[in-house]
A protein has these predicted regions:
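Acidic, Ser/Thr- and proline-rich intrinsically disordered linker/docking segments
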Residues: 1-43, 56, 93-181
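Short Pro/Gly-enriched beta-strand edge/turn motifs at strand-loop
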Residues: 43-49
Length: 181
């Protein structure tokens, strides 16, 4: 991943846009259903992002993606501190999304159902061996799955559902506390 120069507002410098093949036009972005992704949580693997870690607990590293004509831009926001890296599409070996099943209670029938594909882990592997990892919240999973199934990633994208036992959803405890007298 290459560190990318951005303005304070997060706009890419023209030289960086040119390096990654340029931005898509308005109509191209409309046809693609957008070029940006929803935010996910950065875990590890990118030196420029790891260097921003102040050691302050509970600070979340949110990352969003933007497709360029010949690259993928990753923008990190950590408590109003911004960083940006990019990688050319040709340098990406694979993009792997693993889904994890969650057991959630069905309020209507008062039983538990297994919901599939609710939480995920995303890994981007480059040909040079570098791997970066991200965690996907349940509310962003479907949109990220749709984002990486675009034709720009068709030969790089791998999707699987974990064979691990379904995880338990503890949201029912919050619901119970809300109904507590």
């Amino acid at each position: 991943m290459k560190s990318v120069e951005i303005e304070r507002s997060g706009v890419l410098a023209d030289s960086e846009k040119a390096y990654f093949g340029g931005a898509y036009s308005f109509w191209e972005r409309i046809k693609m259903s957008g070029v940006g992704s929803s935010k996910i949580v950065y875990l590890n693997g990118i030196a420029a992002f790891d260097a921003m870690n102040d050691g302050i607990e509970n600070e979340m590293n949110f990352v969003s993606f933007e497709i360029m004509k010949n690259g993928l831009i990753l923008r990190l926001n950590r408590t109003q501190k911004l960083a940006c890296v990019g990688v050319k599409i040709t340098e990406i070996e694979k993009i792997k999304l693993t889904a994890y099943r969650i057991v959630v209670p069905d309020p209507g029938l008062n039983r538990k159902l297994t919901k599939i594909i609710h939480r995920g882990v995303l890994e981007i592997t480059e040909y040079n061996g570098e791997v970066c990892s991200f965690s996907i919240f349940t509310q962003n999973f479907e949109s990220l799955l749709k984002y990486f199934t675009k034709k720009e990633f068709s030969d790089k994208f791998e999707y699987s559902v974990s064979d691990a036992a379904p995880e338990k959803d503890f949201k029912f405890l919050l619901d119970l506390l809300e109904r507590w007298p």
